[in-house]
A protein has these predicted regions:
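Acidic, metal/ion-coordinating pockets
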Residues: 2-11, 19-429
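Polyanion-binding surface elements
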Residues: 15
Length: 429
C-alpha cells in the first residue's frame, strides 16, 4: 500500500513539474512577443502615418487636378491688315546708309504688344538676291522684320498673292527671316513636312491657318511639286481637311484668308460662301484680307457659340491713299482685338473690339529717286478724337480727317453701310 502511494505521488510530481515547465515556457514566449510588439509600435505608427500622408497627398493631387480642369483661361488676340511696302515707303526709310522703319508702328505698339498673341499680314517678300521692288512686284529690305517685331507682333501671315513675287527662294527667305527674328509664320511651308501652326496662349491652344485665292499667275513658273510643298491655296477640299485637323489638335481655330475684290467695301458672294463654309467646318474666327479696304463684320451662331468674321481688315501700312489712288478707304484699316476663354474643355469667343487705324504720311527733308520722301506712321484713330492723347499733335484739318476715318470705319464694320452683311455691334475700344 505504502509502495503504491509513493509511486502515485511520484507520478503526480512529474506531471506538475512538466506543467510548470510548459507554463514557464508560455509565459516566456508571451513576454517576448509583448516586448517585440512594444519595440515595433513606432514603426507601425510611422507606417500608418505614411499611409495617411499618401492618402492625403493623393486626395490633394486629385483635388488639384480637378481644380486645374475647372480653371478658366483667357487670352487676348489682335490681328491687323496688309503691310504693303511700296517703293516710296521703304525708299523714304533710307537715310543714305541704312533703312530705318522704327516710326512705322510706334503709335500702335502699346496696343499690339499688350496682346497675348498678335497676328500680322506681311504682303510681300524679302529676298536680298533680287532687286528691291514696291509694285507690282513686292520685295522689301530685311530691316522691316525688326520693326515688325519691335511693334509686338508674334506671328505673320504669308499666304497672299505676292508671296511668289521673288520665286520659291523668296518665299523661303521671307519665312526664315521672320523665324530668325523669333517670329512665327503661317500660310506657307519652308519644309513640306511642316504641320499646322498651333500657339499655346495662357493654356489655350490656338491653331492659325492662312490661304490665298491665287499667286498672280506666277505659280505657272514653278513645278507642281513646289506648289504642293510650299503653298496653301483655297482648294476647298484641302481647306476643309486643314480646318478639321486643326479642330482635333487645338482648342480654337483662327483663319486669315486672302480673297475678294480689291477696293470693294463689301464682300463678294464668293467670300461669303467660302467663309461660311469655314465656320461650318470648325473655324471660330476669320480675319479676312486682300481687298486693301475694310469690309463689314458678321457674327454667326453655331452650336450655341458665337463665331466671328471680318471680311477684310484693309491696309495697315501702305502708300495707297486719297492723294495717290483717289481712294480714301485705302489709308484706313483696323486692328481687331478679341478675347477668348477656355472653361474646362470648351473654348469660346467672349469679346470683340475694333481699333480703327489711319496711315499718316508727312514730308521729310530728303528725296527718293527724285521724288519727295515721307515719314509713314500708323495712327490709332481713337488717339486723335477730341481730347485724346494725340489730338493736339496734328493740325485740325488732319485731326478731323482721322476722326472721320474712325467713325466711318466703325459704321462700316457694324453693318451700317450699303451692301453690308449684318454687322456685329463691335465695341470701339
Amino acid at each position: 500500500m505504502n509502495q503504491r502511494q509513493n509511486s502515485s505521488h511520484h507520478k503526480r510530481a512529474v506531471r506538475e513539474a512538466r506543467l510548470a515547465k510548459l507554463l514557464f515556457a508560455f509565459i516566456a514566449i508571451a513576454s517576448l512577443a509583448i516586448i517585440i510588439f512594444i519595440l515595433n509600435i513606432p514603426s507601425i505608427i510611422n507606417n500608418e502615418n505614411n499611409l495617411l500622408t499618401k492618402n492625403v497627398s493623393t486626395t490633394q493631387q486629385n483635388s488639384s487636378t480637378t481644380s486645374e480642369d475647372k480653371e478658366v483661361h483667357t487670352a487676348r488676340i489682335t490681328a491687323s491688315g496688309d503691310m504693303l511696302y511700296h517703293d516710296i515707303v521703304y525708299g523714304s526709310a533710307f537715310d543714305g546708309q541704312t533703312y530705318d522703319f522704327k516710326n512705322d508702328y510706334e503709335q500702335i505698339t502699346p496696343l499690339v504688344s499688350s496682346a497675348d498673341l498678335a497676328l500680322g499680314d506681311f504682303e510681300g517678300t524679302i529676298n536680298p538676291d533680287r532687286p528691291l521692288a514696291g509694285y507690282p512686284i513686292f520685295n522689301a529690305p530685311e530691316e522691316v522684320v525688326q520693326s515688325i517685331k519691335d511693334a509686338g507682333y508674334d506671328v505673320l501671315d504669308l499666304a497672299h498673292n505676292h508671296i511668289l513675287d521673288t520665286g520659291i527662294s523668296g518665299l523661303k527667305y521671307t519665312a526664315n527671316a521672320f523665324r530668325k527674328a523669333g517670329l512665327d509664320i503661317f500660310g506657307v511651308k519652308v519644309d513640306p513636312n511642316e504641320g499646322i501652326l498651333v500657339k499655346e496662349v495662357n493654356g489655350i491652344k490656338v491653331a492659325i491657318l492662312g490661304f490665298s485665292y491665287g499667286f498672280n499667275g506666277i505659280e505657272a513658273s514653278i513645278s507642281q511639286e513646289d506648289y504642293n510643298n510650299h503653298l496653301y491655296d483655297l482648294n476647298m477640299d484641302k481647306v476643309k481637311a486643314q480646318i478639321e485637323k486643326a479642330e482635333e489638335i487645338a482648342d480654337f481655330t483662327i483663319i486669315m484668308p486672302q480673297m475678294g475684290e480689291e477696293y470693294r467695301l463689301s464682300p463678294t458672294d464668293g467670300q461669303i460662301e467660302t467663309y461660311h463654309k469655314m465656320i461650318e467646318w470648325g473655324a471660330d474666327v476669320i480675319f479676312g484680307g486682300h481687298p486693301h479696304v475694310a469690309e463689314p463684320t458678321e457674327t454667326i451662331e453655331k452650336d450655341g457659340q458665337k463665331k466671328f468674321i471680318i471680311y477684310s481688315m484693309g491696309n495697315l501700312l501702305s502708300n495707297q491713299r486719297i492723294e495717290t489712288l483717289d481712294r480714301i478707304w485705302t489709308e484706313r484699316g483696323v486692328i481687331m482685338d478679341i478675347t477668348i476663354q477656355k472653361d474646362g474643355s470648351q473654348t469660346t469667343l467672349t469679346s470683340v473690339q475694333a481699333h480703327p487705324t489711319w496711315v499718316s504720311r508727312t514730308p521729310i527733308n530728303r528725296t527718293f529717286q527724285g521724288y519727295p520722301a515721307y515719314d509713314y506712321q500708323v495712327f490709332l484713330a481713337e488717339d486723335y478724337l477730341p481730347g485724346a492723347k494725340y489730338a493736339n499733335t496734328v493740325d485740325e484739318t488732319t485731326r478731323q480727317r482721322i476722326e472721320k476715318a474712325y467713325h466711318e470705319m466703325l459704321e462700316l464694320l457694324n453693318g451700317s453701310s450699303t451692301n453690308s452683311v449684318g454687322g456685329s455691334n463691335l465695341t470701339p475700344n
